[in-house]
Regions:
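Conserved anion/nucleotide-ligand pocket segment
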Residues: 212-213, 217-229
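A broad structural signal for alpha-helix termini and local helix breaks/kinks
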Residues: 57, 126, 222, 279-283
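Generic recognition of short, well-ordered alpha-helical interface segments
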Residues: 182, 209, 224, 270-273
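Core alpha/beta nucleotide-donor-binding catalytic domains of modification enzymes
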Residues: 2-216
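Internal, active-site/partner-interface "lid" segment
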Residues: 200-207, 228-237
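AMP-forming adenylation/ATP pyrophosphatase catalytic core
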Residues: 2-8, 12-44, 66-68, 97-101, ...
Length: 324
């Protein structure tokens, strides 16, 4: 679609995401002069982010591309990415991955984790401490709605975090408040090429059904729903951050591993909160609601030294040793 780079005079002030990046540029200290690493799939969103970053930091930007080899078009995506980066003169690093989920694991989740690991590895090779991701407001709304369908708690309702660390590398989403449709319209108006992933049309996936069936109905009934839903996600993120602070303080009180008597002195909601926090820190997979409730019942029943606890939590086990 169009040329690989903007044609004619470019009105950069009309780029929907430029203001957010400019604020980042204005807030940077003199010491922050490392590479600006952008995760670049070749799609519209990452193309818009790479182009905007290239405009602001032409000597520092680099592109990172992960080929998942999950569909026949993957090789075409990589060829497109290589051609665009060559046209723009942007350094590019590419990594090939082949996600192989275990029998009970989700291919989507395994592929996503493989992508983060690959991006972190590419960023280290490039000397970058942070990878920029092009998720926008509509992506955040889809994530929130997907979490609601799964009965998620605050961590899920908070949506995608603006900042996070994985595999020793920071990940930044500067455009969670930016309209994705406006980004695509800007690219089209300036003749910038991008690829459309055919898997995004596959409505066997829940996220795609939300995108193609639910969001248009919400848009028709509640035109400002994307802004208000994204605001709800920000409120949930703030509340979750507060719970994390409280859990860390409670963990200092009850010790690690938790002392049963000190844990019992907390209210049940605080027990649940600190147990989730401790299990995450211990590297356990997320406990189900049923598992957590069973753990709380057994903790409440511990009134003698001989009372034992042994139950499955996530993919591991929780048990009592002595007074712990």
């Amino acid at each position: 679609m169009g040329a690989s780079a903007p044609h004619g005079a470019v009105d950069w002030s009309s780029h929907p995401g430029m203001a957010a990046l400019q604020r980042l540029a204005d807030s940077q200290t003199a010491g922050e002069q490392g590479p600006v690493a952008v995760a670049y799939s070749g799609g519209a969103d990452s193309t818009a982010l790479l182009l905007a970053a290239w405009r602001l930091w032409p000597q520092r930007v680099c592109a990172l591309h992960v080929n998942h080899n999950l569909q026949p078009a993957a090789a075409d995506f990589e060829r497109h990415v290589r051609r665009v980066c060559a046209d723009w003169g942007i350094p590019l690093r590419v990594c090939q991955v082949r996600p192989t989920p275990a029998p009970r694991d989700s291919l989507e989740a395994v592929a996503r984790e493989a992508r983060y690991a690959a991006l972190a590895s590419l960023a280290r090779e490039a000397g970058a401490s942070t990878v920029w991701l092009a998720h926008h407001r509509q992506d955040q709304v889809e994530t929130l709605l997907l979490a609601l369908t799964r009965g998620a708690g605050l961590p899920g309702l908070a949506g995608m975090p603006r900042h996070m660390r994985r595999h020793g590398i920071g990940f930044l989403r500067p455009w969670l408040d930016v309209d994705g449709a406006a980004l695509r319209a800007w690219l089209d108006a300036h003749g910038v090429s991008y690829v459309d992933d055919p898997s995004n049309q596959d409505q066997r996936h829940t996220r795609n059904r939300i995108r193609h069936r639910l969001l248009p109905v919400l848009q028709e009934s509640f035109p400002a729903f994307a802004q208000t839903f994204a605001r709800s996600a920000r409120h949930a993120a703030q509340a979750q951050a507060l719970l994390e602070e409280m859990a860390q303080a409670d963990l200092q009180t009850i010790g690690q591993p938790p002392n049963i008597r000190r844990l019992q002195a907390l209210s049940e909601p605080r027990q649940a909160n600190v147990l989730r926090h401790w299990l995450r820190q211990a590297g356990a997979r997320q406990a189900s609601e049923a598992q957590l409730q069973q753990a709380l019942r057994q903790i409440a029943a511990c009134r003698t030294r001989g009372h034992r606890i042994h139950l499955r939590v996530g993919q591991g086990y929780l048990w009592r040793q002595g007074e712990v």
